[in-house]
Amino acid sequence: MRSKAIAALGILSLFASIVPAFGQTKIGVITSLTGSLAAFGEAHKNGYAIALDEINAKGGVLGKKIELDFYDDQSKPDQAVQGVSKLIDQDQVPVLLGSYSSESTKAIVPAVSQRETPLIIPTATADNVMDSKSPWIFRVCAGANDYAKETIAFLKANGAPRKMAIVYENTNFGQSNMKAMTAAAKEAGIELVAVESYEAKSPDYKAVLQRVKQANPDVIYFCSYLLDATTLMRQSREVDLNPKYYTSSGTGFAAAEFPTEKGAGKNAEYTFSVSQWLPEAKWAGSKEFDAEYFKRFKSHPAYHAIQAYAALRVAAQAINNAKSLDPAKIRDAIKNINMSSTPFGPIKFDNGQNQHPVLITQVQKGQYRVVFPADAAETKPIIPAPVWSKR
């Protein structure tokens, strides 16, 4: 009798592990809701909310509504790893979305792969988050190499500067973008006259910026999150640093708050950034997403929000295509997914990487405007950036 009871309990346990709570299907989300990256985590949460309502309004997945199971990584990689254990081991989610930063995402890749659960990455651009070649890992956003190559293509088409400085935070995110741009600049024949790292969230970068000023670059390429992007531009003005081009690997320089008084304000003018989306992008539903976001949250979204939206759309489509909550079947469905039209553009994965185009934007009169490539441009770039004394 005891063996039969144990067997019965085992079957019930297995059944509970693959069947969600009645009437709903849980999808796990790790993002940064507190800590230094909370502004980006909030953008994630907002993007997920719009996708969630759209999907559930159309019947959810497999006839059941989706519920998002959030875990706050507190902007810390070790907390993100704990989130994997909580969401997969305890909550038994069949697919995971996250995290925000490259640091936290790189930390969770081995843990998710070991648990044989699909991970859909919305925003982490460091290319080494994909180094494992794990069949369980998929990235919606473009990576650091794509950012560097498109920035170089833009520079070649707009004045072809010969000297560059790279200023990057000393983290996985910053190092990955620095290495990508170093290689791209070398290939393009652009001289690197300064490569300066800094510790994130410091109050004073003037010593770094003074060294860059002495090197006299035509263009600066920043790799920074929002707080540092704001400080770097304010202190660039204070030390009277005047390159012809202020460029960046996005992130802080592409945040919705950056050109506002919550960020760099007027100091953001004329800065260039890579971007993966703007409302003006020529993708079906792009402007409608922007309008819905503004209606709900009283601000216009940066691309981080729509990347989260896209990640959840992929997860839902994959579950429906798989006709199952089995993680392996969902993984195979993601591999074969071909979403030809979304507000984030077409989505199709090649070895886990979505082939997403990169845009170059410039802050003009407090707004991000697409200036490159030519077939997507709204307006012409303003080059050179006016010197600070003439602004």
Where are these regions (language model features)?
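Extracytosolic ligand-binding ectodomains
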Residues: 3-15, 22-391
